[in-house]
Amino acid sequence: MKILMIEDNVSVCTMTEMFFFKEGFEAEFVHDGLEGYQRFTEENWDLIILDIMLPSMDGVTICRKIRETSTVPIIMLTAKDTESDQVIGFEMGADDYVTKPFSPLTLVARIKAVIRRYKATGKAVIDEDMIETECFTINKKTREVLLNGEPVENLTPKEFDLLYYLVQNPRQVFSREQLLEQVWGYQFYGDERTVDVHIKRLRKKLASEDKPFLYTVWGVGYKFDED
């Protein structure tokens, strides 16, 4: 297992490295946020461990940027035992969190649990231009969508972008505000009901007797799920 740990506390990294070695994990440790994100983009990793408080770029920002292109499992580290930090991490796409100070054995156990869940949930296979799941093949370059091998016709540009983003992040719940930011862009100042309208249209175009695909999470937002 290839792990990238972005943590500015050298002592924590040194202690953790010994336990990773015993488990047979291949780990790289980076102590700067911006440098750590750069390392993420340069290689393929099986798991990312992120401290929230980092120089140059904080862990929450790194997590959000990673989730723009990847479903790699992410564990957040925080020195603050507060619910707000945990919620922010989960909202940005983290899979789990560990509160400092922690036992390396606890971190190893969390890593194994996250990897088990990751393998069991059938995350999307993603590269720069293509997403392939059990039911969908989505080509970002040609903007083509296949559902069970059949083309999905007449998607508007924003419908395609919204579907691509949700399929890229399976089972992750997004608020309307988050979807406006991620799909329409930070410069978009429209009504949040715009998201509802696009979801409704997508559901009609993806109509399936077996699976709804796009689910409403009442009081929160929407998620994509093939189960």
Swiss-Prot record:
Write down the SUPFAM superfamilies for this protein, in alphabetical order: C-terminal effector domain of the bipartite response regulators, CheY-like
Q: Which UniProt keywords apply?
A: Cytoplasm, DNA-binding, Phosphoprotein, Transcription, Transcription regulation, Two-component regulatory system
Any single Pfam family the record assigns to this protein: Trans_reg_C
Q: From what superkingdom does this record's organism come? A: Bacteria
Which SMART domains does the record cross-reference, listed alphabetically? REC, Trans_reg_C
**What are the Response regulatory domain coordinates in residue numbering?**
2-115
Which gene carries the instructions for this protein? yclJ
Q: Specify the protein name.
A: Uncharacterized transcriptional regulatory protein YclJ
Q: Name one GO cellular component term.
A: cytosol
Q: Tell me, which GO biological process terms does this entry list?
A: regulation of DNA-templated transcription
Q: Which residues bind DNA?
A: 128-226
**InterPro entries, sorted:** CheY-like_superfamily (IPR011006), OmpR/PhoB-type_DNA-bd (IPR001867), Sig_transdc_resp-reg_C-effctor (IPR016032), Sig_transdc_resp-reg_receiver (IPR001789), WalR-like (IPR039420), WH-like_DNA-bd_sf (IPR036388)
Principal location class: cytoplasm
- Describe its function: Could be member of the two-component regulatory system YclK/YclJ.
